[in-house]
Amino acid sequence: MSPISPPASGVGLGYGIAIAVSILVLISFIMLASYICIRSKSTGRDEATSDVVLDLPSPAAEVKLGLDRPVIESYPRIVLGDSRRLPRPNNGPCSICLCDYEAREPVRCIPECNHCFHTDCVDEWLRTSATCPLCRNSPAPSRLATPLSDLVPLAFQIR
């Protein structure tokens, strides 16, 4: 008797072709779905952008965080002499623009903390923020709550 050999059928080849066709169909479906999603998002962005523009609050509802010009102008303004020394011993550069102070340059000091800065720098800063750029304390007449001013009393209570 001779050994029995398996039938010579194309069953193994049929599975390979079926798997390859299935993978190609799946890849095609994923690419089509991605194209549709990207296409719908790009057209949806234009509509969403126009909705946002239409739903903006009115300028009357704008909140101003900085100080008014008369308050800023009330802070002492000095012109540096040839020695270029500031009234308080913070002889480093301006903390806002990081430039050195020059002779005969106008400097404005914040009365609450005595920190000094270039007049143009600190005026612009105080128009947008009501705190000292260096120590973050509020120079405003109506004491605004600042992170540092809240922590200082706590530090004295611990001791």
From Swiss-Prot:
Domain notes: The RING-type zinc finger domain mediates binding to an E2 ubiquitin-conjugating enzyme.
Transmembrane segments: 13-33
Membrane topology field: Single-pass membrane protein
Taxonomic path: Eukaryota, Viridiplantae, Streptophyta, Embryophyta, Tracheophyta
SUPFAM superfamilies hit by this protein: RING/U-box
Source organism per UniProt: Arabidopsis thaliana
Name used for this protein in its record: Putative RING-H2 finger protein ATL69
Reaction(s) catalysed (UniProt annotation): S-ubiquitinyl-[E2 ubiquitin-conjugating enzyme]-L-cysteine + [acceptor protein]-L-lysine = [E2 ubiquitin-conjugating enzyme]-L-cysteine + N(6)-ubiquitinyl-[acceptor protein]-L-lysine
Pathways involved: Protein modification; protein ubiquitination
UniProt cross-references to CDD domains, sorted A to Z: RING-H2_EL5-like (cd16461)
Family the entry assigns: Belongs to the RING-type zinc finger family. ATL subfamily.
PROSITE patterns from the UniProt entry: ZF_RING_2
Subcellular location: Membrane
